[in-house]
A protein has these predicted regions:
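Glycine-rich, flexible loop/turn motifs
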Residues: 21, 94, 127-128, 286
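Short, motif-level signal for alpha-helix interfacial/capping segments enriched in acidic residues
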Residues: 1-3, 92-95, 148-151, 272
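Short alpha-helices
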Residues: 30, 116-187
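Active-site cofactor/cluster-binding pocket
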Residues: 68-126
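An acidic intrinsically disordered interaction segment
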Residues: 1-2, 104-112, 135-143
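Short acidic, glycine/serine/threonine-rich loops at helix termini
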Residues: 26-27, 55-59, 101-103, 123-126, ...
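Hydrophobic helix-and-loop "lid/oligomerization" segment in the mid-to-C-terminal part
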Residues: 1-20, 24-71, 75-87, 165, ...
Length: 328
């Protein structure tokens, strides 16, 4: 169905969520390659300067050094480029407000959604195809499946295969979280397509400053109600602050007896909450209380107009109440 819809449009825009991560850009690149195989004018609407995807973007430009056109466009450029022949494929997000350019959603009539986050009340309503699979480990896994079984099998470039492999790697925390049979099948396909495990590992190594900050976040963590690890972090003037916070949340799960970990990162008048668990706690329902979402073991939320300390207290209050009500 996706291929048939793409064939009837001349311009194809691929858009992810704000503050894109490896899964977001990897999935976008996979769809980009499919679209180019169908000889379509294709544009990825994404903030290419986001620190979380910097290694991938650098690799793309190295591999595309001889090509003139830029595969990434800004929100403003996308709004100017769109016309009646355009369609929009949204990856790794299904909430309109969390997309890179919500205005684009309103101005293009043919929309396809590919995502692995569970749908909430706030979801993209006017999609002609909505492929939302909460049991998938990542959107890259879903896109890899599409690329494997579609008639016009596109030939991925090495950096594109690397990006998709890294998307699976990051979202599964190195094949530990939500990695099913189809996850490994997708990874095997990407390896055959040119993904290199060593190259991907080098791509996502931490710099020393980030390592120190992550350690500091872990050191100041508070154990709440004997089973929740909570830490806060002022991310101003730290590149990739939300990524560091998410990595710290992952690391806190290694503490014995911890059912869930939460790292709150203050950045640009917003508090970003990274929530993680292994299997005993549904962090998604907790983050939904704050207008966020995600998965059973990996979720997030953004809080506006609140201080870091107040946000931490709000989280504690919510955890205690949900625990008393038997919701967690």
């Amino acid at each position: 169905a996706l291929r048939e819809i793409m064939l009837t449009h001349d311009k194809i825009f691929v858009m992810g969520h704000k503050n894109p991560d490896a899964d977001c850009v990897g999935a976008a690149l996979g769809i980009y390659r499919l679209s180019k195989a169908l000889n379509k004018s294709t544009y990825i609407v994404m903030d290419k300067d986001c620190p979380a995807i910097e290694p991938i973007v650098d690799g793309i430009y190295r591999e595309r050094a001889d090509e003139e056109e830029d595969i990434f466009v800004t929100n403003e450029e996308a709004m100017l480029l769109k016309d009646k022949s355009a369609m929009l494929i949204v990856v790794d997000v299904n909430v309109p407000a969390m997309t890179e350019c919500p205005e684009l959603l309103k101005s293009i009539s043919t929309i396809v959604v590919l995502d692995h986050h569970r749908q909430s009340n706030e979801t993209i309503k006017n999609a002609v195809v909505s492929y939302v699979e909460p049991y998938a480990s990542s959107t890259c896994e879903m896109v890899a499946e599409i690329l494997q079984y579609i008639v016009d099998k596109p030939k991925l470039k090495n950096i594109e295969a690397d990006a998709m492999y890294s998307g699976i790697l990051v979202d599964t925390d190195n094949f530990v979280i939500k990695a099913g049979v189809r996850t490994f099948e997708a990874a095997a396909y990407l390896r055959r397509a040119g993904a290199d495990v060593t190259r991907v590992r080098k791509m996502f190594r931490e710099d020393m400053e980030h390592c120190r900050i992550r350690t500091a976040i872990i050191n100041k963590a508070e154990i709440y109600m004997d089973e929740f690890a909570i830490s806060t972090f002022d991310g101003e003037n730290v590149s990739g602050a939300t990524v560091v916070g998410a990595k710290a949340a992952n690391a806190l799960l290694n503490i014995q007896g911890i059912r869930g970990s939460f790292v709150l990162t203050a950045l640009q008048d917003c508090i970003y909450v990274s929530a993680r668990s292994i299997d005993e706690l549904n962090v998604q329902v907790i983050m939904e209380k704050f207008g966020g979402g995600g998965h059973l073991t990996m979720a997030a939320a953004q809080l506006k107009d609140v201080s870091l300390s107040d946000a931490a207290e709000m989280l504690k209050h919510t955890l205690r109440k949900m625990h008393e009500d038997g919701d967690i």
